[in-house]
């Protein structure tokens, strides 16, 4: 925990705020009843019809953006997650930066039609999708907006994410 008593968690790959976190929350609940193979598609389908976009504020560097209808925010250290999706195809785990994909205002139909495109990364210039890099980011908004990291439910907003450069030493053959 931090000096302020806040819980501190470490993630290696990708954290999400909004839609993706809701899918993970439901997947953890549905998986107990539907089995592991059906948990993800059932949770995704359920969220497509029930997820409500909410207003949030995103702070990074000297920037602040009000997002009136957050669909999803991915904080990516790695490139891939969720069965081959690439929210951040340029992400590098050793560059000291998060690659952020902010998706706002997309309806369930638009999410469903654009979801397959994330296999190759977000389409360039896609309306409602903003990409940027930062060392840290703070997301504030209603306490009902979920947060997940590496497939684990972390709780709800507010949430802050900071890169810990050169903290993990990996040996590969």
Predicted feature locations:
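Catalytic core of DAGKc-family lipid kinases
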Residues: 1-71
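Active-site/binding-pocket entry motifs
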Residues: 17-18, 29, 79-81, 106-108, ...
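ATP/nucleoside-binding phosphotransfer catalytic cores, i.e., glycine-rich phosphate-binding loops
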Residues: 60-67, 92-93, 98, 102-173
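Glycine-rich phosphate/pyrophosphate-binding beta-alpha loops
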Residues: 16, 20, 74-88, 153
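A generic local structural motif
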Residues: 43, 58-61, 85-87, 123-125
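Electropositive phosphate-/nucleotide-binding environments in soluble metabolic enzymes
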Residues: 17, 35-38, 91, 105, ...
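Short, surface-exposed, charged loop/turn segments at secondary-structure junctions
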Residues: 29-31, 88-91
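Short acidic/glycine-rich loop or secondary-structure boundary segments that cap or lie
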Residues: 20-23, 66-68, 81-84, 108-111
């Amino acid at each position: 925990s931090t000096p302020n008593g806040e819980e501190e968690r470490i993630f290696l790959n990708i954290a999400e705020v909004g839609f993706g976190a809701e899918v993970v929350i439901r997947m953890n609940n549905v998986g107990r009843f539907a089995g592991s193979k059906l948990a993800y598609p059932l949770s995704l389908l359920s969220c497509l019809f029930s997820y409500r976009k909410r207003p949030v504020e995103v702070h990074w560097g000297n920037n602040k953006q009000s997002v009136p209808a957050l669909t999803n925010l991915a904080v990516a250290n790695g490139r891939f997650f969720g069965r081959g999706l690439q929210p951040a195809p340029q992400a590098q785990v050793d560059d000291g930066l998060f690659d952020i994909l902010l998706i706002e205002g997309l309806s369930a139909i638009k999410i469903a039609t654009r979801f397959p495109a994330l296999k190759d990364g977000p389409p360039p210039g896609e309306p409602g999708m903003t990409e940027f890099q930062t060392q840290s980011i703070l997301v504030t908004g209603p306490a009902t907006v979920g947060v997940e990291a590496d497939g684990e439910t972390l709780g709800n907003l507010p949430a802050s994410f900071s890169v810990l450069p050169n903290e993990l030493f990996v040996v590969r053959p």
